């Protein structure tokens, strides 16, 4: 007789009450990723343009970044999040719309900081496109 499959006892997602935290918006030309953490840096919720249902070139659009930010904010508000500090990184199109979407979802933004890394003449950039 075959053995009955035993239920794995993995770590269950518990509901925490986190009133304030940080939101990291990584916006590249191809995608936008929004991660919301508590003050210690432990991830509470995240969403990307790809996880929000966009594929291909549509992932780099401002609307995709807005949808991802709304999705991440909704899950963070369910955990009790009220105030966030926003860290924006990258050159993508969805930077401003993601910040507006976080504000529109009901989160109070206390600080906006641009943490895009800028090289002091580091690696050679890719060659220019000729279309």
UniProtKB/Swiss-Prot annotation:
Q: Which UniProt keywords apply?
A: Ribonucleoprotein, Ribosomal protein, RNA-binding, rRNA-binding
Establish whether keyword Oxidoreductase is in the entry. no
Task: Please note every region of biased composition (Basic residues).
Answer: 1-16
Coiled-coil portions: none
At the top level, the lineage of the source is Bacteria
Q: Where is this region: Disordered?
A: 1-20
Entry's Gene Ontology molecular function annotations = rRNA binding; structural constituent of ribosome
InterPro entries reported in the protein's UniProt record: Ribosomal_uS11, Ribosomal_uS11_bac-type, Ribosomal_uS11_CS, Ribosomal_uS11_sf
Q: Does the keyword DNA-binding apply?
A: no
Which GO biological-process labels does this protein carry?
translation
- State the GO CC annotations: ribonucleoprotein complex; ribosome
What does the subunit comment say?
Part of the 30S ribosomal subunit. Interacts with proteins S7 and S18. Binds to IF-3.
Q: What does this protein do?
A: Located on the platform of the 30S subunit, it bridges several disparate RNA helices of the 16S rRNA. Forms part of the Shine-Dalgarno cleft in the 70S ribosome.
Name the protein family: Belongs to the universal ribosomal protein uS11 family.
Quote the protein name from its UniProt record: Small ribosomal subunit protein uS11
Lineage, opening ranks: Bacteria, Bacillati, Cyanobacteriota, Cyanophyceae, Nostocales
């Amino acid at each position: 007789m075959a053995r009955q499959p035993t239920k794995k006892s993995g770590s269950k997602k518990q509901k925490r009450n986190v009133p304030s935290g940080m939101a990291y918006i990584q916006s590249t030309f191809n995608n936008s990723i929004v991660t919301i953490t508590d003050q210690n840096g432990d991830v509470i919720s995240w969403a990307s343009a790809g996880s929000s249902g966009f594929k291909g070139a549509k992932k780099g659009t401002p609307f995709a970044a807005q949808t991802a930010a709304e999705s991440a904010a909704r899950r963070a508000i369910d955990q009790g999040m009220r105030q966030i500090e926003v860290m924006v990184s990258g050159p993508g199109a969805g930077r401003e719309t993601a910040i507006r979407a976080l504000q529109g979802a009901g989160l109070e933004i206390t600080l906006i900081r641009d943490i895009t890394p800028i090289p002091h003449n580091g690696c050679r950039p890719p060659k220019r496109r000729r279309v």
